[in-house]
Amino acid sequence: MASYATLLEKTRVPQPSIQRFAVISVFSKLRSAPEQFGSEAEAGREAISFCLTSESITVVDQSVHELCRLVSDSVLDLSRGLLELQSALEGCDSKLVSLFVKGLGFLIRIGYERNNGNWKFNSTENHPFVRIQSSRVETQTELLHQVSLFVMHNRRLGMVGVCEFLEPFLNFTILRIPLSDSSSSLFARELISSMASLCCSSRHEALPIFRLLMRCLKYIPGNNLEVIVKILVDAYTVVVRDLVGTGLEVTEVHLLGVQLVDGVLFLCASPHVQTTEQESVIESLKHLLAVQKDLGLAYSHDLSLVVLSLVFMLAKSTVEHEQLCILKFLLFLLKWKTESENLSVKDAAGSSVESLLLFPITALMSSPSKSIKVAASKVLSIVENFLVTVSNAPKIEVHTSKGDSPLSRVGSVVFRFMQQLWHQNDYTPSTSSFLRVAYTNGSEKQETYLGPVTWNSLLREHAERFWDKKKLSASFCLSQEIPILLGAVAGVMVMHPSLGADAIGSLTIIGGIDSKMSVPLLLAVLYFSNLLSRTNVPCQSLLSKLLGLLPSLAAQQVMIPLVVQTITPMLRKDAKGLLYATAIRLLCQTWVVNDRAFSSLQEVLRPQGFIEYISERHICISMAASIHDVCKRHPDRGVDLILSVQACIESQNCPVRALGFQSLSHLCEADVIDFYTAWDVIKKHAQHIKLDPLLAYSVCHLLKWGAMDAEAYPEDAENVLNILWEIGSSMQKPHDSQWTKARVSAIVALGQYEVSFMENKFSDFNKNCTYLLFSETNAEILNALEDLSIKIMIHEHSVRRRYVREKKVPGSKIEKLLDVIPQVIFPAGKEIKTGELPGAALLCLSYNPRDVKFGSSRSFHDVHFQYEEAFRVVVKSLQLSRNISLALISLQSLKAFMRRWMRANILSIDATTKELSSDKTSKATNNIMKSLVHMAEEALPRCAENIALALGALCAALPAASHNIKASASKFLLSWLLEHEHEHRQWTAGISLGLISSSLHVTDHKQKFQNISGLLEVLCSSKSTLVKGACGVGLGFSCQDLLTRTEASASSDIDSDSYRNQEERLLGRIVRLLSSILHGFLHTPCDILESLSALFPPGEEDNVIGLPQLLDESSDDFDDDTWGIAGLIIGLGMSVGAIYRAGKKDAVVKIKNLIVSWIPYADSLKQTSGSNSKVSVRLFSVGSCLALPIVITFCQKVELFDAHEVDDIIGCFKDLISELLIVRKSGALRKRLLMASCIGAGDLLGSVLNEGIHPVKIESVKELLELFKKCYSGLYPPVAHFGGMLGVVNVLGAGAGNLVYSHPRPRAPPASSEENEISYVSGPLLSNAYFTQQLTPVVQEIFLIAQNTKDRQLQHYAAWAISILRTYMRSGESSSLSNENQSDDSDRNSISHNVPEHTMVMKLAQGLTNPSFPLAGSPLNIGTMASALRCLSHAPRLPNLDWGATIRRLMKQETQTDVTQSGDVPKEITLREECFKFSLAHASEFDELLAFLDELSELSRFKALEESLQSCLLCHLGGLMRIFSGSRMNKLFDDVSCFVVSLSSDQTYSCDQKSSLRVSCWKGLSQCLEETSLESSEYVTKIEKCIELLFAVLPVASQSPRADQMGSVKEWSEAVTCLQKSHRDWLYKFLQVSNLEPGNEKTNFQGDLKKIQAKAKLAKLGSVPFSELGKLKAIILNCEESDIWDVLIEIVAALHHAEGGIKRQWLIDAVEISCVSSHPSTAIIFVGLLSSICCEYMPFLNLDRSTVLSDMSVTVTSLLSDPSYEVVTEPFISFLWTSLERVYSFATESDANARLSSQQIAQSERDKAPMLVKVMHYICVAFRDHLPLEKQLRLASMDMS
């Protein structure tokens, strides 16, 4: 600095000229000095600093000039110059400030020029103008001048660039206003004013400056906005006048003015803006538009947004002069619009935002200000024209431009919602709304809301919730504008051609939301009444509906006089009749709302009125209806009108009389009037009620109240009952709906009287009621009769006699005969050896320990030895004669013998030891097993055959859990089966081995497969046809236990699945081999056998054996062929059950048809290729006769057997047996065929009769019995005699030789059964009184033959046959092995269901069980039968009838085409469903009903049911659980699991049917969870497994379901209900979600989404705490929005019902997660959703992805302005700012830079980022006061263009 010292010293000289010269010299030297002494050197810097910091103004002034010259000449760097001047400015004296500011201004202009107008700074703080302003306050004056100079100097470079350069400075100036003193505010105003002045001076370059100032408006504090707007408007008016005058940029300046007005109003009408007086702002904006209009500019349709903002401001305003100002503005706009020359009808409709003004303007008509009323009326007159135009052009689409801003405003949201309502066919939003989400998804009213939901219903729910909150917190209230805006929408919709009525309902709801709306609504009613009365309005029909709104306004006490005053003019005597009648009804409804109106109403309802207006029908009816309403709602008030009630009854007008009777009925109901006293007065007016159905209905409605005092007035009560019965039983007009209503009323009235009283007054009352029910077809009347019948049954049960249980006495001669058979056949005193009657001995001999002593084992050995010796004798004498039929009968008898033997052993062990039941059974069976094996080792062939059968019988009689015994027996029999050299061992061993396989335990898979494999091996390898046939029978037995368990199907366990596959393969091999062998024996082509083989193709592991190897070509033994082929056919017939379970129903039908075709003389019934060979058919006929009953029995159970087939097949058997009896040829085939046909015919007939499905002709039964009698009494071989006797026995149900199906013991016929001549019989013959008498001689005859010792062989067969019948009749008494196993079967059967004949239960039961019951009529219709079943389902007990047969017949009856179907019966109600429900109700009492339910629940049978019955069964899983055993329920749950899994891929169901079935399954599982307890863990595990499988196929819940997706809504509803009832620990574990990764194969993304949705729904219902849902925040909000949209909505719907603290926490957490999430749009959209559903404007918001973000400008700002959310506003805005910076950086940088700087944001967010930034920026600006200044500046610096 030394080199400059001399010159610097001269600057201190107090001489200005010397000082200036010194400064010039210093800077000249700096300019020319070498580098080490230049301006950049230390000495140079110090010299410059010395000059600038001088206290002399002259020195500083010259220094600034010289410094600027250095910079201008590029000697000094610009930044250095700015730095020097800025530093000097900050430390200078105040008098020097202007000098430095001027210098800085000059340098800024130079810098801008050098950068060609593109001078940018990295932050607002570095902006030179900002630095100047920030340095000190004194700079402001000069700074304004420098800014103007900058603009004027640099405008040549482009005004747009100049404005961009100044924008940060302008924003900084504005943003500093709230943080500094008033000078900052003043400076900002002056700065804006200065720039506005520049616009005036540079009119052709003014538009960019205007745009700059408009962009800054959003940062201006509200108290400064008024002045700023006035400045801008004044400047604009100058500019626009000039530009329009010159014709330049007219369009741009026009649009700019509209944008300015819209932008200012957008700020003023924002929800977060506090209500302040904005009159001057509005006046300024109006002035701007007035200038445009004066200049001739056209009305812009963009002004529709201005109107929308004014609508909101008008609704929100409470200040009169502000309201007046807005009205004047609106009036100006509307006039301008209507004066526009280009406005057409379409334009008016397209810009119909003005229609929203209707209700707010009407509301202002109640203002006390005359000026407001005048202005409002002017606006209303113009709006009315728009409204009428819109109502006449409802199909024109409405659009509104949103200008440059995509952000919503309250007005646009309301208008958009109104548009959507207008352009649809109902009041249901086409897209889902937030109201729907809030109040229908998963709520307690979800069932109500399935399907379309109207805005009315949702709004009503919203209003109810509002009042609930209001009750909890008195401070809670809605903003003033909400009900007005709701009214604005509804007011427009009133004019809709089809939705006007719903809109009026909405107005009613709005009145309930805010009591202050009563007067506006009254004015709206008056206005619309006037408007709708005009001819040019197409909605005149709404007038009455609109007037109906008046009474609802009377809820406010102050409104009563106004409402009554409004109605009163319509009650003038000269008024029109219809108007007068309407006024009466309105006044009545007003009284309903508020009792203060009663005096006015009472005056109108005077009795004289009916005389005065006798010719005015409408008025009289209106008066009567009002009287009726008063009596119904307030009986005490009704007493005041009693004379008017009497006048109604005495009227000649039927509707008036009817209403009078109804009014009196309500008074009697309330007991304010005595019924019989009133009846004495008015009964003369009820004499001709049958002439008018309405009158009859009303009188019946009255007469039911006579029940209370009927005993006190018996005569009058009897007359009343006669009237009711006469009307109720009248069928004069069966299809008249009015008479139907009257009859229902009469029957309901009868139900009010005591049953005992009616029985005393009516003879045969029950019979008449039953006849009436069975003769009725109308569904409504049937329902009423059901209720009456149920009441009668309950009464009968309550007064029933207490029957004493007496010792059972045989009820018929047949039973008496059967009871004495053991004593007669084996008398104690005679020596009749067991070996002479071996068959009877097996069934009758019984040895019981009589001298058993504790601790003694002698009795056990004695009894065991007795049975062993008897068995030795029997096996030696019982000849099977290589007859498979005899073998089966012997096996059946041996099973009974083994059961008695075991029972005796167990009883003996009971007396000697105290062991467990299973141990006793095992010990007793082991002893028998040892004895049998010991005897078998050295037995003769005949004995060996029987012993092999005995082993099978022993195992069949054992419990399934006896593994060891059955395994030992199987091993022993397998060894015999494989001894090909011993045929006598092989063939019976094969039969027994199959029987054992059918009774193995579920876990004995290996043993079962070994047995079946052994049978298949011998079937293929044996050369004996008899052995092949026996193996066929054994395989048939084995099929009974194949594919019976389905836990494998529903399990993911590989071994279980493999087990089922093995069973399917084994079944295929069995059917394939049997078909192939039979085909070979047939020697002719047979399509059915070939198709059966094709249905079960061989597997890879099968050894395909050729047909020649399967057949023994050298076998010429005709006897072997007959029984061998019979065995194969029987085996094939036995396999139908397994085939059906395998899902091959067609194969079952084919087998049935094939076997029928093999019966001789059946060719006319079924034709099958290859059946023409007589020899083949004769060989096959024996087996087909024996197999057919088995097949038909199964087909009956699964409904594959038609009624018309019964008579045909029975006829075939009759013809066959008749032919065989007539032809006297001898021969083995003939006698075997005769035996087989008799056994088969009897078994078939017995099966058909016991099932009870198909009635059989009486003559056919008699003819068959006569043929059987001829057979056993004629000169035929003994085996034929045996067949005839077994035919008789089988007809009675004994099922001799049939080990697959057994029939329940027949019930004794009713003691008082009438022996009427009948043509058909249904049910067991022994349960029929007529046939019991007919059969007694037949049984006696067989009994006598069994006593005849002349023919021992015949005696043997007779004794055996009669013993089989005795065993069958005693089957219910001795079916268990031990006393403890006889749980309740015997008790249940012994319950005395003594129901008298005259009772209602018996009459109904007889009508259903007996098709020929006299009361039933012919034919019964389905609806009638269903009603009778429903009645009996409620019966406390049923008579002891054959209910199993009845239900099966009714099940079949509905599917028959000849059954009448009432047209009144709803299609969804089916007789089959009622059969199921009836069975479920009484299955605990009747075993046959339990068996019926067991069959229906079997998976294969269940799959064949119709969809409606499947749904019904699934819905009642809980009921089944109450009656099924534990093991059966386990199997049922496994079946359900299997069905659920298979349902998804089943093509036989439609999507709706699948959904319906799943819904039913959810309902059933819910029932099961209610029935189970925590202790029944096994059930719970099974249920939970079903839930998991159902949940897996549950569709992801959609928040906007289409009409075809409503099934999924129902599914979710039931699923959530079910999950609510599940155990909490399991539920939390099941719904646990660890991560959400779409596309990741390791995770089930869709399943996880459903779990989250389920958890949200449960949280909404309070079943799961919100803390559980909160654990998933981070997982959910880090996913892409498109993947989880529905999940987000579900969570928001749940949070809507949460506490405020939970909502606020979710709001904060969501925006915080957006700061780190790779998908920030998801979190922000979630914030938008949550804000939408929680803010006040929720009723107007549609749930649309495209609008959620844009609506956040309304929803979030509204929510954060709520006092309850103010506590979270600051942290929310802080996190939102952080997220905004992150997303803005991502959106503005290139892809490469974005990856580096914002690595966590996914690239899929790039398209959403601009909109995200815009929304977040707007919210941050709106709440910028919660951000520090530096963040506000960065916020303002963000480019939003």
From Swiss-Prot:
InterPro entries attached to this UniProt entry: ARM-type_fold (IPR016024), FOCAD/RST1_DUF3730 (IPR022542), Focadhesin/RST1 (IPR045163)
Membrane-spanning parts: 250-270, 296-316, 347-367, 479-499, 513-533, 546-566, 943-963, 982-1002, 1123-1143, 1175-1195, 1229-1249, 1277-1297, 1719-1739
Main location: membrane
Keywords on record: Cell membrane, Cytoplasm, Lipid metabolism, Membrane, Plant defense, Transmembrane, Transmembrane helix
Domain of life: Eukaryota
GO BP term, example: lipid metabolic process
Protein name: Protein RST1
Phenotypic effect of disruption: Shrunken non viable seeds due to arrested embryo development when homozygous. Alteration in cuticular waxes with elevated amounts of cutin monomers in leaves. Susceptibility to the obligate biotrophic fungus E.cichoracearum and increased resistance to the necrotrophic fungi B.cinerea and A.brassicicola.
Tissue: Expressed in the vasculature of leaves, petioles and hypocotyls, anthers of mature flowers and siliques. Expressed at low levels in roots and stems.
Cellular compartment(s): Cell membrane; Cytoplasm, Cytosol
Region (Disordered): 1374-1393
Described function: Involved in cuticular wax formation. Required for the synthesis of alkanes from wax precursors. May play a role in acyl-CoA reduction to aldehydes. Is repressed by FREE1 and functions downstream of FREE1 to negatively regulate multivesicular body (MVB) biogenesis and vacuolar transport. Together with CER16/RIPR, acts as a cofactor of the cytoplasmic exosome and connects the cytosolic RNA exosome to the SKI complex. Acts as a post-transcriptional gene silencing (PTGS) suppressor.
Subunit structure: Interacts with CER16/RIPR.
Membrane topology: Multi-pass membrane protein
Record SUPFAM superfamilies: ARM repeat (SSF48371)
Gene: RST1
One annotated Gene Ontology cellular component of this protein: cytosol
Short name of any one Pfam family annotated for the protein: DUF3730
Annotated signal peptide: none
